Amino acid sequence: MVCVFGAGGGKLLRFKGKILSMEYIIQVDENNREIAPIEKLEAHRRGLLHRAFSILIFNDQKQLLLQKRNGAKYHSGGLWTNSCCSHPNHGEGLKEAAHRRLQEELGFDCELEEVFSFSYRAELDNGLVENEHDHVFIGRYDGPVHPNKDEIEDIRWVNLEEVQVGIQANPQQYTYWFRHLMQHYADRIIQRV
C-alpha cells in the first residue's frame, strides 16, 4: 500500500493498483456502540467491526432491485448484491448516509424504513475482511434508475424466489453479505414487502 496525494490535497491510498480516497467510517463494539473513526480500508484490512447499511428497493410488483458491483471495486467486484450498500461516514447519521448513497449509486431517492440489523464476518478472497454491523433499510420505488457506472456494472429487477434460487445454484455470483441476508433473514424481508 502506497500513500499519494490528490490534486486537492486529499490523502489517497493505492491498494493493489487501485487508488482509493481516505474515508473514515465508524468502528463499533458488539453492541453497535461507536468506538472511534477508522479509515475504511484499514477497517477491512484489520477485520474491525464497523457500521454499515444495506438497502433493499422493491417496485410495485414486489420485485427487488439488484446491482452488479463494478469489477474495479476494492472488494467483491463483479458480484450481484442488494440494491445499495455502504457505510456511514464518521459524523454522519445512518439514514442520511443511506439516502446519500442511494442517490450516488442509483440516481434516485425514496422513502426508506430501517427494519432490522445483523452482524456478520467474512474473509474475502483478496485478503480483506468484512466485519459489519449491518442496518437493513427497505424502500419502494417505480421510477427510472440511473446507475453510476463507477459503482455498478448492471442492474435488474427480480422476484425474491428468483434471488433465492440463484443464490442456491450459484452462490459465487453474489456478495457474501447479500447471501447471508437472504439465507438468514428472508422471512423478515418478505413480511415487509
Identify what each model region corresponds to.
Residues 11-21:
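Short, Lys/Arg-enriched N-terminal segments with co-localized hydrophobic residues
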Residues 41, 78, 90, 116-121, ...:
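Nudix hydrolase/Nudix homology domain
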Residues 108-117:
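A short coil-to-beta-strand element that immediately follows conserved catalytic motifs
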Residues 21-54, 60:
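Acidic, metal-coordinating catalytic segment for phosphate/diphosphate chemistry
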Residues 42-53, 63-100:
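Conserved Nudix-box catalytic region and its N-terminal flanking loop in Nudix hydrolases
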